[in-house]
Amino acid sequence: GLVGSEMCIRDRAPGVKMNFVRIPAGSFVMGSNRGYSDYSPAHKQVVKKGFWMGEIEVSNEQFRTIFPEHDSRFIRQLWKDHVHEGYPANNPEQPAIRVSWEEAMAFCKKLSEKTGKTVTLPTEVQWEWACRAGSDGEFWYGSLNTDFGKFENLADKHLNQMAVRGVNPMPMRETDPWYKYYTYQPKENGVDDGNMLMVKGGGYQANAWGLYDMQGNVAEWTSSDYLPYPYNEKTQGMGTEKVVRGGSWNDHPKASTTYYRRSYLPWQKVYNVGFRVIIED
């Protein structure tokens, strides 16, 4: 299949409309020698076979076609006197969050049964290869210094709206004496990406291979165990935690690079972690 060609699985799984783009085979340098030891050494990886990857993260609506009871809940505001729980996270088009790795894999299994295709989570090799889309930088669109406003939904000036006060909470004014105590999260105050929380997939620019929100919006589970580099397929199955890749609306760009890794236990449900799926030939 041609790079960037599209496939939709609506015809095979009634009620589930998901668009996929073709990711080619190839080789690249994975990881980085700058920064934390958990993503070094930089080392060559080969992606032997092309695959299809979901162009956006799995939404609440898509996830509920298989798990109708799923509740992404809300994002808690930074204040104490609440009459409501916070900002909504359950809108149908928002990416599903608080999905454990085990639930994400169960979703893949059910979707495989419905479609007759091999649906799964990407390995972290497949994820980084697809994210980079031919780029060798910190982001598919540039470096840590690039204004990410039109490319990814990361921690920008809108995050200051998490600082609210009042019984029916409203964002604090910058002159409020409490303001500095509730706007402590690392963020790029000079960048405006238009949104505070996770939003419907596809609202920002796609990378060169047609994938949206790879480094922002919500972070994403991979199928891989969290083990020291260099990555080795033979040692998979020996770790207890699973690798999560990409940044989120709540992450500073430094924690959202093409090579940045974080990990959680397979049963953990995390407020800024969702997933996207791949289809293997």
Q: Which functions belong to the PLM regions below?
A:
Residues 12-77, 99-102, 216:
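A short glycine-rich, aromatic-capped structural motif
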Residues 21, 52, 138, 220, ...:
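Residues embedded in well-ordered beta-strands
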Residues 271-281:
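Short, structured beta-strand segments at or near domain termini in extracellular proteins/domains
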Residues 29, 33-34, 81-262, 266-271:
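Functional-site microenvironments in short loops/helix caps that host divalent-cation chemistry
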Residues 1-9:
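Short, small-residue-biased leader/transition segments that mark boundaries at the very start
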Residues 1-2, 22, 52, 57, ...:
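Short aromatic/basic micro-patch
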Residues 5, 18-20, 119:
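Short glycine-aromatic motifs
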